[in-house]
Design a protein with these regions (language model features):
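NUDIX/MutT-family hydrolases
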Residues: 89, 97-130
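A structural signal for short, well-ordered beta-strand segments
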Residues: 9, 46, 64, 87-88
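Conserved Nudix-box catalytic region and its N-terminal flanking loop in Nudix hydrolases
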Residues: 13-56
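Conserved N-terminal beta-strand and adjoining loop/helix that marks the start
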Residues: 1-17
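Short histidine/acidic/glycine/proline-rich micro-motifs that form metal-
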Residues: 36-37, 70, 112-113
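Short loop segments at secondary-structure junctions
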Residues: 13-16, 23, 91-95, 110-112
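A short coil-to-beta-strand element that immediately follows conserved catalytic motifs
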Residues: 57-67
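Active-site-adjacent beta-strand/loop module that shapes the phosphate/pyrophosphate-binding cleft
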Residues: 69-96, 110
Length: 139
């Protein structure tokens, strides 16, 4: 059983995908999205979290990609928790703007620093996207 059940969004622009950094600049990069609240559908959660984190943007062409499970990103290396992410791909309509809970938005590409990524991105999500030819560059 996962300690955190989340919904995440994978969106591309010019061959790069959008990631965010929460809390502080030392935090790992994660996908936009968040935890599903009690009684909330996956669609409702994704829409709410994207608006909370990226501002008033709209989502189009949203489609399920897969469910991934791995160690949760943590600023404290002694904390070991499991996160499960239901990942959806989609297009953002509008300009994403970092909210109060996000300190930085990054369009991550082949020249970006992989060491900044959360464990689930490095270990599970990106290898799967490469295997499925959804990501054309190697990490």
């Amino acid at each position: 059983m996962a300690d955190f059940n989340k919904v995440g969004l994978l969106t591309f622009l010019d061959g790069r995908f959008l990631l965010c950094r929460k809390h502080n600049l030392a935090s790992k990069l994660i996908l936009p999205g968040g935890c599903i609240e009690p009684g909330e559908s996956v669609d409702e959660c994704l829409t709410r979290e994207i608006n909370e984190e990226l501002g008033e943007v709209a989502l189009e062409n949203v489609a399920y990609i897969g469910t991934y499970r791995d160690m949760a990103a943590s600023d404290d290396p002694s904390v070991e928790k499991i996160v499960e992410i239901q990942l959806y791909g989609g297009d953002i309509i509008g300009e994403p703007v970092a909210s109060s809970e996000i300190v930085e938005l990054i369009w991550f590409g082949p020249d970006s620093d992989v060491q900044q990524l959360s464990p689930i991105l490095v270990n599970k999500i990106l290898p799967d996207l490469i295997d499925r030819n959804m990501l054309t560059w190697k990490i």
